[in-house]
């Protein structure tokens, strides 16, 4: 008799946890949009130092990068010229 009560309690607890998971899971699904920035800091000359800003937008050239040594405002320049083409 005690084992039957224990099994019933375990089943009821698992139903409660499944219900809670379903409620939490629906809110997580809506907020899981990943933001990918247009420009990223990359290493162009020195392998261990990020020294340029490169464009990651769709439809652009692969080598569209600005060296910080040549362009002091490389980040701003990348953000202005690099646009998403959807």
UniProtKB/Swiss-Prot annotation:
- Span of the secretion signal? 1-21
- Give a single Pfam family match: ESF1
| Positions in coiled-coil regions | none
- The reply on keyword Signal is yes
In terms of domain of life, where is this protein from? Eukaryota
Single biological process term from Gene Ontology: suspensor development
Q: List the disulfide bonds.
A: 39-54, 44-82, 52-78, 55-65
Q: Which InterPro entries match?
A: ESF1_brassicaceae (IPR041608)
The alphabetical list of record keywords is: Disulfide bond, Signal
Q: Which family does it belong to?
A: Belongs to the MEG family.
Q: What is this protein called?
A: EMBRYO SURROUNDING FACTOR 1-like protein 2
Source organism per UniProt: Arabidopsis thaliana (Mouse-ear cress)
């Amino acid at each position: 008799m005690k084992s039957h009560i224990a099994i019933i309690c375990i089943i009821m607890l698992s139903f409660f946890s499944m219900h809670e998971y379903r409620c939490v899971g629906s809110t997580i699904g809506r907020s899981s949009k990943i933001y990918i920035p247009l420009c990223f800091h990359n290493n162009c000359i020195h392998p261990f130092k990020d020294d340029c800003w490169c464009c990651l937008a769709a439809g652009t050239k692969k080598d569209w990068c600005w060296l910080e040594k040549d362009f002091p405002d490389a980040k701003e320049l990348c953000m202005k010229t690099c646009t998403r083409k959807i």
